[in-house]
Design a protein with these regions (language model features):
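Generic N-terminal amphipathic, Lys/Arg-enriched alpha-helix
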Residues: 1-21
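Short active-site oxyanion
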Residues: 41-43
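A short, well-structured juxtamembrane/interface segment
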Residues: 21-38
Length: 246
């Protein structure tokens, strides 16, 4: 039977697995991000499709890291010469050369670190962004599904390029509850991906505190003094951190 209880059991199992099996990987990722930010770097988060929600979770939110910038397909319209119509096709993430266009529109510095999110880990924009980051000497953290990416018939995957891989635990196809006539319902990659993102933030914040330094964290804009606090921190980064989503 498929109902909310069935999904809740599946989701709880996926969360439990992430908290135990990926603990070391998330710790290593936290060390990479901490080292980058402490050196004046910015976390560059990139995802396409529903993986954008995980990149968004890492950027521009209350309790999140201020030096974190979301790269996205939207950038070629926001900051480049593409029209909104050009980016409406969800298959655009498979377009060769798209990652390079996004890269050229961003203010990426040598000390920056990348978190790239993709369940399949195989679409052209994702793999090319990882290649670009590695080629330019950046550390790359992947949040991906090892089960799904292993089934992709491609020459290179995100997991092959990343310095640290966090497995979101999603099954092949992402949806986790099998249907009687074939196929499955109810995805889990966003759930575990967002959790992995917040666990990563916690690791970074903890390292700042252990070093006796205030963590560069956003306050809610809907609290007294929040806007002023955030503006002071954002001023350090200028155009390197773009808060483009309303």
């Amino acid at each position: 039977m498929i109902d909310q209880s069935a999904y809740a059991r599946t989701a709880a199992s996926a969360v439990d697995r992430l908290l135990t099996a990926e603990r070391d990987a998330i710790g290593r990722a936290g060390e990479l991000v901490f080292a980058s930010l402490r050196a004046g770097g910015v976390l560059q988060a990139f995802g396409t499709g529903h993986s954008r929600s995980v990149a968004l979770e890492l950027t521009g939110r209350a309790g999140g890291l201020v030096p974190a910038n979301q790269l996205g397909i939207r950038d070629v319209a926001y900051y480049g010469d593409a029209s909104p119509r050009d980016i409406l096709d969800p298959k655009i993430e498979r377009e060769p050369g798209l990652a390079a266009r996004i890269w050229e529109l961003a203010d990426i510095r040598p000390e920056d670190v990348f978190v790239i999110i993709s369940n399949s880990g195989a679409n052209a924009a994702i793999v090319e962004m990882a290649r670009l980051a590695v080629r330019h000497g950046h550390q790359v953290i992947a949040i991906t599904s090892r089960a799904h990416t292993a089934e992709m018939a491609v020459e290179e995957r995100l997991a092959d390029l990343a310095h640290v891989v966090v497995d979101n635990g999603a099954p092949y196809g992402d949806a986790a509850l099998p249907l009687p006539g074939g196929g499955s319902a109810c995805g889990v990659s966003t759930l575990t991906g967002v959790l992995a993102a917040q666990l990563l933030v916690a690791e970074v914040v903890g390292r700042f505190l252990a070093a006796g330094e205030p963590p560069p964290v956003f306050r809610s804009a809907n609290t007294p003094g929040g806007d002023a606090h955030n503006a002071r921190l954002l001023d350090r980064y200028g155009s390197r951190v773009r808060l483009g989503d309303a």
